Amino acid sequence: MQPLQISAIVALVVAAIIAIVVWSIALLEYRKLLRQRKIDRLIDRIRERAEDSGNESEGDQEELSALVEMGGHDAPWDIDDL
């Protein structure tokens, strides 16, 4: 093989690896975005039910807690523990 062919093959392999890494990062960010949207919808639903009935929905709070624990993220609301 000529050096030009070898360098072309190496360039294609490097480009494929870079593409896989970029798409993997994009997929992870997209999944994080979907999880955050789901959490936001649950928070909105809890707020609406609390306004309507005067108390919060236990099922929605449990689902929200499970999502927050599953994602390993802190609570999406602000907590001031000063």
UniProtKB/Swiss-Prot annotation:
Which loops or segments lie on the Cytoplasmic side of the membrane, by the record? 29-82
List the membrane topology term(s). Answer: Single-pass type I membrane protein
| Gene Ontology MF, one | CD4 receptor binding
Membrane in keyword set: yes
Q: How is it modified after translation?
A: Phosphorylated by host CK2. This phosphorylation is necessary for interaction with human BTRC and degradation of CD4.
Activity regulation annotation text: Ion channel activity is inhibited by hexamethylene amiloride in vitro.
**Transport keyword on record:** yes
Which residue ranges does UniProt annotate as crossing the membrane?
Answer: 8-28
Gene Ontology CC terms, in alphabetical order: host cell membrane; membrane
Enumerate the InterPro entries for this protein: Vpu, Vpu_cyt_dom_sf
Q: What Gene3D superfamilies does UniProt report for this protein, alphabetically?
A: HIV-1 VPU cytoplasmic domain (1.10.195.10)
Superkingdom assignment: Viruses
Miscellaneous section:
HIV-1 lineages are divided in three main groups, M (for Major), O (for Outlier), and N (for New, or Non-M, Non-O). The vast majority of strains found worldwide belong to the group M. Group O seems to be endemic to and largely confined to Cameroon and neighboring countries in West Central Africa, where these viruses represent a small minority of HIV-1 strains. The group N is represented by a limited number of isolates from Cameroonian persons. The group M is further subdivided in 9 clades or subtypes (A to D, F to H, J and K).
Quaternary organization = Homopentamer. Interacts with host CD4 and BRTC; these interactions induce proteasomal degradation of CD4. Interacts with host BST2; this interaction leads to the degradation of host BST2. Interacts with host FBXW11. Interacts with host AP1M1; this interaction plays a role in the mistrafficking and subsequent degradation of host BST2. Interacts with host RANBP2; this interaction allows Vpu to down-regulate host BLM sumoylation.
Biological role stated in the UniProt entry: Enhances virion budding by targeting host CD4 and Tetherin/BST2 to proteasome degradation. Degradation of CD4 prevents any unwanted premature interactions between viral Env and its host receptor CD4 in the endoplasmic reticulum. Degradation of antiretroviral protein Tetherin/BST2 is important for virion budding, as BST2 tethers new viral particles to the host cell membrane. Mechanistically, Vpu bridges either CD4 or BST2 to BTRC, a substrate recognition subunit of the Skp1/Cullin/F-box protein E3 ubiquitin ligase, induces their ubiquitination and subsequent proteasomal degradation.
What this protein is called in its record is: Protein Vpu
